Structures are given as structure tokens and as C-alpha cells.
């Protein structure tokens, strides 16, 4: 997803401020007992109780022994058989984007162009701002499954610029006035790494702007104030707690957002752990690269250690860079948003400074170019010259891979940061984009694992809903939420439930250099837990989606509790 911020209506902020309240414990000690605990640890995979003191686990095992070891003032919670997992981690998400989705014009799930137009009509009647901005539409299940064009928007709103972002964050549709304000005409050339879609008959711009063409309009949208951005960050963080995340790995942030996050932590308005990468290339990322690794921050729940880069665009908007043309658009092979030498330069310097690099790559060409750049950087900076010997560079998404590149992840020590929900969302258009042979290398979780790679699981929210239960379900079923799986949709790539759990717990901790602190329920580790109403490791596939988050616990503190939860 591209990082773009939006102005929201100030009056929308008022009812959401209540979400900031952070429940706190009267005691620093906590006992969870009569529980169904999956520790994620190889030697003792199951337990029935855990004891926490000062934010860390001091005992894991039987209920009777836990009660004996607990300090006298410990808060004791009888979970009545609820399932406890190591605190779940979203290893790829966009925090402010989650908040903006909650706060402004959300088009997620609109079933048709007509429905989008009706939603826009309603919005225009109530939004008197100079611009109308929204996000979340996807055309793949419309009839016909075609991108909207500026005339579709003009029919509803012609007197103000309108910018509507596709759900993948890599394309927008705008109305004619927005094109005029930006000075985009039939003669405007495509910017490097972007495309201005034009009508093949008239040569006029259609209103669809892909990847690096988006800023031609988006840079004209009024920027949000600090208070609006702060509210978006707070809303995104607290929404993440409600769905069970204990850490979010923020794929592309800014100096401004880091400053605002520090304020939110100091004001006790957020509790979510974060592991962040600076958005690059750009001035903030370059300053970070010059400064070197900055793991220490304003709060021990916030770590800034990486730089996020982009190689290509998205598959749905045909910006993903492919080795051969799109099967449904033979004139296109996608886009390169940055030249490989940019990735190589930053990766090489990052190795010397101890900074992790994570690069967005979706198409098979995009992934190959990133692997090539990483390999060249590793060769240029031997271990003796690195601040961190094992850099754990990542490729974000790794969606479409040529068979020859799958073993390279393990060989190079590159982590595949993947989002299993993408497979069940994209199954409606990926086969037509890729064709029957190339689609076999798409969302290739099993192939990567069998080749020795490490996969870390995230959501890419707000591109996807951002729900760990959906990610777990998608990993083990590779089916849509209604149970549908397209023909030849690669069900052999499914994961076991144990692997799916590691995808959301231990492997994200490893990807953040935190496997000694988080990712399993073991003595000495941070007391981060996600407590569910159902045993997702055992129930039938269809019942996984019925599981609810009852508690989210971070450092032994209950930071979210379901309203109906009854403590015993």
C-alpha cells in the first residue's frame, strides 16, 4: 500500500475519543488459569496457566502450581477454558491508514459502480469540504469488472475535485475537475513508475492514475493537521487491540508520525507495541539511513529499525512488475516504482548501519529484482563490515514468484513477509491477470516453507480488513470467507494450523529481532497474550471465523476486554 494521508472532517473525531481509554490492572502481577494455552514452544507446547510479574512471564504450566507461585496480591483470572495464544503480531500494516479508514469516506465492499456512485452522492450532500476523498473500492466483482472512469464520477460530483483510492492503495480514480486542477491532459506523459490511463479511442485521460502518477493529484489534496493525524494513529492502534493484535509492524512511517506516536504513548492513549520502518526513499528515510540504527525511542513499546521501499505496484491495478505481459493486458508488464540501483544503494548502506530493509514486491519481475539487489548488497558488504551480521532483510508481499526464485529466499536469508488474506481476496482476478501457469507461483506459502524460507504473516490493513482470525483462516483453508475456492487455486499451498500460528507469533518476532522477547509463551518473555473464545487450533475450518477476541494483554496489562467477558 502507498502511504498517503487524508484530511478528515474534525467533527468526526468526537465520538471516537472514547476508544482511547486504556484499562489498567490494580496489581503488577497476573495469573491466567483454567485456560487452554498454546505456548508456541517446542518443549512444552500446551499449558493450563501462566503467571506474570512486572510485565514478564515467571511461570507456565499447571493451574495448581501457578496459584502456588503467584504473589499474594496477584490478580487471578479463571478463564473457564478460553484459548490463550502468544500475543498476535500483524507483521505488515499501515497504522494511520487503518485509522483514516475508520474516520473518513470508506468505500470498502461497495458491490457495484452504481453503489459507489450512490455512496458518493450521499457523501457530497453532507461533506462541504473543498475536496472529496475516499478509499476502498475494488472493481473485480463488479459487473462489468472494469475500472471506473472520470465520467462516472462527474455524473455525481462535478463542482469539486474528487479522489477515490482503490483498495490496494496503488491506484485512484478522479473526476474531470481534479484532472484539470492538476493540469493533466492527453499530452501529459507518464511519470517514471506511474501510468496515466488514457482512452484508446480518444487519447484523453480516463481519470485512473496508477502508482507514481497518483501524486500528480494527491499532492494537491490539503494535508491533515497534526491533531487529525494523531487521531488517525490512535484510532488505528486501538482498533488493532480490539481484534487481538499485540504488536503492529508499521510498513512505512514518517518523522511526523513517530513524533505523534511518542505523544500518544506519553499520554497513555495507546498501548499497542509497534515495530516501524521509515517510508523511503525520501528525506525521512535518508536522515534515518545517515543517522544509523535507532532502536531506542521515546517508549519501549516503539522500535524504529527499518526502511520501507517499493519495487513495483499492485497486481489488481496491473502495476506489479511481471517477467512476461499480463495475460489479460498483453501490452502491459507492470511498473517499476524505483530503479533497482536505488534499492541496492540503500540496502548496501543499511548493512553498514544495522538497519533492516523491507521492500514491497508483488510481481515475479519485481521480486527477482529485489532478490538480485539484496544479493549484490550482501556481496558488497561482507559480514565483517556489517553492524548486524544477520540483517534479516524482508520482501513485503512476495506474491508472485518465478519457480527459480523460491529457493533464493532461504539461500539469502530473506524473509517473505506475506498476507494470507490477499490470496482469498485476489482469487477473483489473479488467474486472469497471470494465466494458468504463472498463477502456480502466486501466494506460494507451502513452496517457500518447504524450501526453507521464513514467512511472517500480516494483513496490509487497510488494504485488507486487518483481522488475525481471517489471516489464520486464509492460511489453513485458502478459501474465501464463504468457503469458495476457485478452480486450480493451489490448495496444496495451505499451511498447517501450527504453521499458521507461527506465521502470526514467532516468525514476526524473529523478523523484528525480538524472538528472545516475544512470539512464544515462555518464562522470561514479555507477557503478551491474545485470548480467544474458541480453540482455533482444533475447531472445524468453518468455525474458525466464529472465534472472538475476549482479551488482549500486553506486558501483563489487559488493554482490551470484550464487553461481555465475565471474570471468575
Report residues per predicted region:
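N-terminal secretory signal peptides that target proteins for export/translocation
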Residues: 1-7
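Divalent metal-binding segments
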Residues: 27-33, 42-290, 296, 305, ...
Amino acid at each position: 500500500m502507498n502511504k498517503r494521508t487524508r484530511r478528515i472532517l474534525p467533527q468526526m473525531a468526537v465520538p471516537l475519543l472514547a476508544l482511547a481509554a486504556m484499562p489498567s490492572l490494580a496489581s503488577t502481577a497476573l495469573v491466567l488459569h483454567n485456560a487452554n494455552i498454546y505456548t508456541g514452544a517446542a518443549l512444552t507446547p500446551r499449558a493450563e496457566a501462566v503467571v506474570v510479574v512486572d510485565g514478564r512471564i515467571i511461570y507456565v504450566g499447571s493451574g495448581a502450581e501457578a496459584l502456588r507461585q503467584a504473589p499474594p496480591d496477584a490478580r487471578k483470572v479463571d478463564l473457564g477454558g478460553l484459548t490463550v495464544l502468544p500475543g498476535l503480531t500483524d507483521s505488515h500494516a499501515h497504522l494511520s491508514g487503518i485509522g483514516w479508514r475508520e474516520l473518513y469516506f470508506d468505500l470498502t465492499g461497495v458491490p457495484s459502480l452504481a453503489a459507489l456512485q450512490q455512496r458518493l452522492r450521499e457523501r457530497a450532500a453532507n461533506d462541504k469540504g473543498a475536496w472529496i476523498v475516499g478509499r476502498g473500492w475494488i472493481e473485480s466483482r463488479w459487473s462489468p469488472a472494469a475500472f471506473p472512469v472520470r465520467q462516472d464520477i462527474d455524473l455525481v460530483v462535478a463542482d469539486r475535485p474528487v479522489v477515490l483510492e482503490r483498495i490496494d492503495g496503488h491506484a485512484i480514480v478522479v473526476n474531470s475537475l481534479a484532472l484539470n486542477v492538476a493540469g493533466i491532459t492527453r499530452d501529459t506523459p507518464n511519470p517514471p513508475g506511474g501510468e496515466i490511463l488514457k482512452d484508446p479511442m480518444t487519447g484523453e485521460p480516463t481519470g485512473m492514475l496508477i502508482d507514481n502518477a497518483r501524486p500528480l493529484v494527491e499532492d494537491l489534496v490539503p494535508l491533515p493537521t497534526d491533531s487529525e493525524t494523531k487521531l488517525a494513529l490512535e484510532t488505528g492502534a486501538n482498533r488493532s487491540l480490539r481484534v487481538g493484535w499485540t504488536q503492529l509492524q508499521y510498513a512505512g512511517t514518517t518523522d511526523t508520525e513517530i513524533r505523534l506516536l511518542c505523544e500518544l504513548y506519553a499520554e497513555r492513549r495507546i498501548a499497542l507495541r509497534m515495530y516501524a520502518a521509515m517510508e523511503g526513499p525520501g528525506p525521512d528515510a535518508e536522515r534515518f539511513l545517515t543517522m544509523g540504527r535507532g532502536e531506542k525511542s521515546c517508549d519501549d513499546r516503539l522500535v524504529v529499525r527499518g526502511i520501507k521501499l517499493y519495487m513495483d505496484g499492485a497486481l489488481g491495478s496491473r502495476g506489479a512488475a511481471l517477467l512476461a505481459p499480463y495475460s489479460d493486458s498483453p501490452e502491459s508488464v507492470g511498473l517499476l516504482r524505483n530503479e533497482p540501483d536505488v534499492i541496492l544503494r540503500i540496502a548496501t548502506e543499511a548493512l553498514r548501519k544495522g538497519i533492516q530493509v523491507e521492500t514491497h514486491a508483488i510481481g515475479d519481475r519485481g521480486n527477482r529484482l529485489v532478490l538480485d539487489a539484496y544479493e549484490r548488497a550482501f556481496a558488497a558488504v561482507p559480514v565483517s563490515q556489517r553492524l548486524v551480521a544477520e540483517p534479516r532483510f524482508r520482501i513485503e508481499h512476495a506474491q508472485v514468484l518465478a519457480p527459480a526464485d523460491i529457493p533464493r529466499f532461504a539461500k539469502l536469508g530473506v524473509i517473505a513477509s506475506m498476507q494470507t488474506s490477499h490470496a482469498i481476496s485476489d482469487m477473483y482476478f489473479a488467474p486472469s491477470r497471470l494465466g494458468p501457469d504463472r498463477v502456480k507461483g502466486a501466494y506460494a506459502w507451502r513452496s517457500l516453507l518447504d524450501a526453507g524460507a521464513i514467512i511472517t504473516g500480516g494483513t496490509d490493513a487497510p488494504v485488507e480488513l486487518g483481522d488475525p482470525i481471517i489471516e489464520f483462516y486464509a492460511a489453513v483453508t485458502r478459501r474465501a470467507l464463504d468457503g469458495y475456492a476457485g478452480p486450480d487455486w493451489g490448495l496444496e499451498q495451505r499451511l498447517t494450523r501450527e504453521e499458521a500460528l507461527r506465521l502470526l507469533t514467532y516468525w514476526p518476532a524473529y523478523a523484528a529481532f525480538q524472538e528472545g522477547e516475544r512470539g512464544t509463551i515462555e518464562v522470561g518473555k514479555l507477557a503478551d497474550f491474545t485470548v480467544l473464545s474458541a480453540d482455533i487450533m482444533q475447531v472445524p475450518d468453518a468455525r474458525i471465523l466464529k472465534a472472538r477476541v475476549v482479551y488482549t494483554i500486553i506486558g501483563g496489562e489487559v488493554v482490551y476486554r470484550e464487553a461481555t467477558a465475565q471474570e471468575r
